[in-house]
Design a protein with these regions (language model features):
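Dinucleotide-binding Rossmann-like beta1-alpha1 core, especially the glycine-rich loop
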Residues: 53-119
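A secondary-structure boundary/capping signal
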Residues: 14, 39, 51, 90-92
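Beta1/beta-strand and adjacent pyrophosphate-binding region of the FAD-binding site
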Residues: 3-19, 36
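Short, flexible hinge/linker loops that cap or flank conserved catalytic cores
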Residues: 3-6, 29, 88
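Hydrophobic alpha-helical packing residues
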Residues: 27-28, 113
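Glycine-rich FAD pyrophosphate-binding loop
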Residues: 28-49
Length: 119
């Protein structure tokens, strides 16, 4: 197997989980051609495989919210570009406030969701 690997590369991404695959994908999208992705087994077969795979849309900051929206759109885009299923299933959620404090928190989240155009 080592004989198949080049001796040099500008970028070596170690780990074929969601983070490593994302880095390799985005580098390729930016035109980087001298990139290697190393994974000891199958892609996404480690920690990523064990994760629940939930992609919430509203984050604790505007940066996290933008990243989550980008990720959700990327999964949809990848399915269109490749014709392969990412396994993305969009489901809603219902949260019930059982106290006045929790109601205020949910109202704050609803306002933030509107501000960031989160559906």
């Amino acid at each position: 197997m080592n004989a198949d690997l080049p001796k040099n590369s500008k970028v070596v991404v170690i780990g074929g989980g969601v983070a490593g695959c994302s880095v390799a994908y985005h580098l390729a999208k930016l035109g980087w051609k001298d990139t290697i992705l190393l994974e000891r087994d199958q892609l996404t077969s480690g920690t990523t495989w064990h994760a629940a795979g939930l992609v919430g849309q509203l984050g604790s900051s505007s940066t996290i919210t933008r990243l989550r929206k980008y990720s959700l759109n990327l999964y949809k885009e990848l399915e269109k570009k490749t014709g392969l299923s990412t396994g993305l299933k969009q489901n809603g959620a219902i949260t019930v406030a059982t106290s006045k404090e929790r109601l205020q928190e949910l109202l704050r989240q609803a306002t933030a969701a509107q501000l960031f155009d989160v559906n």
